[in-house]
Structure formats: C-alpha cells, structure tokens
Amino acid sequence: ASDVYKRQMYGDPLPEIVQERLDRELNSIISNGYAVMYIIAQKLVWKSNEDGYLVGSRGSVGSSFVATMSGITEVNPLHAHYLCKHCQYSDFDSDLVKSFSGRSGCDMPDKLCPRCGKPLSKEGFDIPFETFLGFKGNKEPDIDLNFSGEYQSKAHKYTEVIFGEGQTFKAGTIGTLADKTAFGYVKNYYEERGVHKRNCEIDRIVLGCVGVRRTTGQHPGGIVVLPMGEQIYTFTPVQHPANDMTVDITTTHFDYHSIDHNLLKLDILGHDDPTMIRMLQDLTGVDPTQIPLDDKAVMSLFQDTSALGITPDDLVNCQLGALGIPEFGTDFAMGMLIDTQPKEFSDLVRIAGLSHGTDVWLGNAQTLIQEKKATISTAICTRDDIMIYLISMGLDSEESFKIMENVRKGIVAKGKCDKWPEWKQDMIDHNVPDWYIWSCEKIKYMFPKAHAAAYVMMAWRIAYCKVFYPLAYYAAYFSIRATAFSYELMCQGKEKLEGYMHEYEKRKDELSKKEQDTYKDMRLVQEMYARGFEFLPLDIYKSEPHHFQIVDGKLLPALNTIDGLGDNAAVAIAEAAKDGIFLSKDDFRERTKVSKTTIELMSDLGLFGDMPESNQLSLFDFGA
C-alpha cells in the first residue's frame, strides 16, 4: 500500500532524490530489524484515521520518509520541493527551491504546475533521517504517537486485535521516595519514639531512603508486546497497579525501562490536539489536512492581534493573537514570539524547538539574539541543527552525529562527556564560531525538529479555525482544553468577567493553582467577548454534559461549567432531562443526585427559572 501511495504522489519512476532517500532508509530499517515497528505503527494510525481521528507523531519519527510514505506521520522530511498531485511533476533542484534549504516547503511562493497548470503543492521540512536511526542504524528508534485522548483506550485495545489476547501488557512504573517525603518519614520515626537525632544523621538516613520503591503505577501510554510463543514471566512478573485487585488492568511489575531492551514497547499516548481538531472538523466541515500552512492572516496571530479584529488594548497584558494556541499560548512562549518576530512557518518550528528544550532559550539563544551574535535562523533551535551545521562546516558526519547526541542529552553541559575537549578542538579547527560552541555547552535537553514540526502543524490548524471559524474554535477550546472554566465567573457578560479579572490581577502572586487555571481561561473568554461573541444562558435541558454548542450565533455552555458540578453529575442531568421536564427542585435533586449546595448555586444563577421548590402544591398556588 505504501508503494502505491508513494508512486501516486511522486510518480513512476520515482524522482532520483526520493528513490535514494527511500533506499537508504529501508536498508537501515530492514537490516537492523525495525520494519516490524513501522508496520505496527502504520496499523494503529490507519485504524485511528479510519475512525475519524488524526494522529500526531512525537519525537524524531517524522525524520523518516518511510514513515511519511507509510502514513505514520504527516511530516515530510525531504528538503523543500514543489509537487503536483495531479500529474506528479516535481521540482527539487531549481534555484528557488534550493534557496529554501533548511526551511519549510510551505514557505515557498505559490506556483502553478508548468506541465498541467494546476496549483503546485509545497512539501518538505528538510529533516535528516540520521536523527532517528543514526548513520549506521545503531540508534534504537522509538515511534511515539499522539492519539486523541478520547481514542487512546481504543488504540490500546486494538493492539490486542493485532497481536492477540494475552500478548500485550500495560507498561508498569515504579514510584520512589522523594527527598522531602523521605525526610518526613525519618523525622516522624524518631519523633514518635522520642529519640533526638542530629540533622547530619537524619540527612544520612534520608539519603539511604531516597529512591526506594514506594508504590507502582502504569505508564500513561506504554504497551509492552510479548513475542509469540513466549510467556510474560520469562521477562517480568505482572500485577495490578498499586496492587489494587479491583482494577481490570495488568501491568509489568518491573519498571518498563528495565525491560525495554528485551521487549517491544509501543508509546500510544493521549493528547488534546487530535481531539480538538476532530471537534473542529465536526463543527466546521473543514478537512484539517487541507488547511494551508502559509495563510498570512494565521501567521499574523504570532505577530499581533489584527487578524482577530481587536487591539491589544482590548485584552489584559496580551499583545498577540496566540492565546489558546497549543505550544504558543503561554506568556513564556508569547514572550519568545515578541523577541524573535517570526515571519514564516519555519520560524515557528524553530521557536517550538527553543521553547521545549532545557537551557536552550533562556541564558542561551535569547542572549545570543539580543547581542546580535545569532538570529532565529542561525541559533541552535532543534537537535538536528547541530548535526547539519557541523557537517556543513566540514566535520565528519559520524562525529557530528555523536556531538549532537551528547549535546542534546545534556551530557556535555553536565561535564560528563570525556570526548568533548577533543570534539571542541575539532570544531575550533573547522572555524565553528565561539558563540556556537558556548551555546552547545549550555544545552541540557533539545527537541528533534520532526517533533517540533508535527506539533506546529497541529497548532496551525487550530489557529486557522481561530481566525476563520471563531465560534467553533472557542466552543472546542472551552470543551477540551479549558481546565477551570466557570459559568458563574465567565458567562455573565464582559463587564462582570473583567471585574473578576481585575480582582485576580490584584493578588496574582497569591493565586491558588485552580485560580491560576481559572485566570488562564478568563483571558480567552475576554478575547472572545472583545471579538463580539457572547454566551447563551446555560439550559438544563439543552446544554450537553461536557461540550459547548453553537446556537444562533452564540455559545451554549456545557453543564460541567457550573462550579461544584462534576462530570458524572453533568451526565446524570443530561440523562434525566431526556426523561421529561423537572417538576420541581426536589424532583431535580431526586432524579440527578446533585448536591443541595450545587442546586442552590444553580438557583442563584437563575438556571431553574420559576421552578417550584417541591412537588407539593399550596392553596395559594390555586388562588393565584
């Protein structure tokens, strides 16, 4: 199927550059025995797509063109090129295309196919395969996939269909004692026995306790696969998480890191982006895979607020339209956007790399950009940048790969790389600038470019809907990503909301975690109001348990936005409402099992209208 797909896309015979990349990758994948991982990942992704959910790739699997052609990842790692999907014309080596080396194909200007006159597709992110498997296939690959949180459990179940019942197990985790907990245990032990110990002795005993197993759990997405004909007990005991026999889940007893060299582990993780994109597709009818990655209005969200039709004065402490966009909506990320002034998709990929690394931006790239020693284009943003740049400066490719691996894992920064003095001298001998070497010595962890590209593609699609389908965007965001939405605080109009925001601002250093989350949601609600959109009053008969709805050009809030009303209670109200109207508040409480306090709050918010307190009629009701 992959062979048919690639020839449908690139033509038959394949362009030389495509054939060469496929041959090089396949040789490395097959000779090292990794083909089975690709086939499993392909089956899982195809099944999810068939059921209506996109899958995002994590990590460096997007570096593999074989993964792209297998449908495992949407990231095309070839260098920027034009492609006609009607007649298979391709352009890999015109001067214009070559000028986009190291950048994303989607940033190239629009062109028509010289052969058939149709608009050309702009492809490629220029990512080397070696980031995934190394130059000799000697790096163990890891195919991590982001499934919709709503679909994750189905994907886990589907592994049983692929391998058979009893062949897959949830990966176990081991929770160990942390410093503070161990200190508490030791201190309490001696206090309870009336024994006085010096602090240095307590510290000595604490050191012996730190790291000791405390409990067991399960990895959020790890599935361990057993080879046919083997028993799991050959490799590890199995158990229920935290030894809870009532739980219907079996995990490996050993931490999966202890056995992942002996057994295949699949990372089937849950993520909000695919869920949100599915909801946006349902609300708008727009196919997310057809959203252009070069729309100027969408790009402007990362520069100012003009595409939203508002000014920064309409918002509290926000100069951009990036609020609520995955990867870019935090104050930290927006500060980076203001500092770096992105102009194209490639810049966003680089910024995503900077923002997710450790000691890559603060005290590193930010300083270099401020001192005009580097730009967003020349600073080290993703791990691939190091290898590509060093090879371009004339260093040996295998050595460049090893330098990249040691820098991106923080081994160099921690002073634990014995080869670093030799490599550093080699870099100096090849005229690598001092600032570049200084930057390498600071980095503690780096993202792969493929991961950054995959995440930015998802974020861009959501940003596109924010510009062109605002109500659908806000409905999806408040349904899926908002963590502390409050009907009482946010849906009573712009003035009331801003009053609450002002109150939160005054004590911003004292806000609890829940209040911080509430304030984060308030900012997006304020933006929605500024764009001229409103909420309808919540309706106990029409509102859905968890999802906001678009009704008559306004948003109808979900039931679970009422403070104190949990997800289960919201479902109970929706189910009870299907059985007919509530005769009274007593009837409502009886049928929904909602607490008295919550009913009083709902009553104060006017959600019951003129509903009587009880089913009993008074003589005064007849006299009315």
Please place each PLM-identified region on the residue numbering.
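Noncatalytic, beta-rich nucleic-acid-contacting surfaces in large DNA/RNA-processing enzymes
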Residues: S2-A624
